[in-house]
Structures are given as structure tokens and as C-alpha cells.
């Protein structure tokens, strides 16, 4: 079973492996854009919470990396919109 299928099926160990593999890269993605350490940490956390909560929508057609950064991009846009209003 691959990681995407395992996460989609709710196997926490697979989610933990994905978190361990991608959380630093995700944090750096946010830090580069928001330039605030705590905000980048919060947005990273939101990304992985959303990944877990929407795990049933994960697709085998796209890499896990692509799907995580799609979520991260959406969260960043939402954050920036809130900041602008």
C-alpha cells in the first residue's frame, strides 16, 4: 500500500511519516512568504490538519507533495485575504 492510500484509509503512521517528511519544507514555504516565524508555524499546522481532515479526497493521480502544497497554497491565500481585510 502506498502512502496516499494509507493516509486516505486513516492509517496514522502513514500520516506521521508524511508529516515528518514534509513539515519542514512546508514551514519554509510559508516562512518565505509571510516572513513571520509563528505565523508560518500556524499555517504549517493548518496545512496538516486540513490534510488529515480531507484525507478521503486524496488522489492517486497526483503526488503527495503536490497535494500537500496545493493545500498549503490555499491556506496561504486564505491567510493573505484575511490580512488584507
Residue ranges and their predicted role:
Residues 6-28:
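A short, charge-rich alpha-helical start-of-domain segment used by transcription regulators
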Residues 11, 36-37:
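Short loop-to-helix capping motifs
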Residues 19-20, 27, 37-54:
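Conserved RNAP core-binding helix
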Residues 33-34, 61:
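Helix-loop interface residues and adjacent transmembrane-helix termini in multi-pass membrane transporters
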Residues 17, 25, 39-42, 63-71:
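Amphipathic alpha-helical recognition patches that constitute DNA-binding helices
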Residues 53-60, 70-85:
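Arg/Lys-rich amphipathic alpha helix in sigma70-family domain 2
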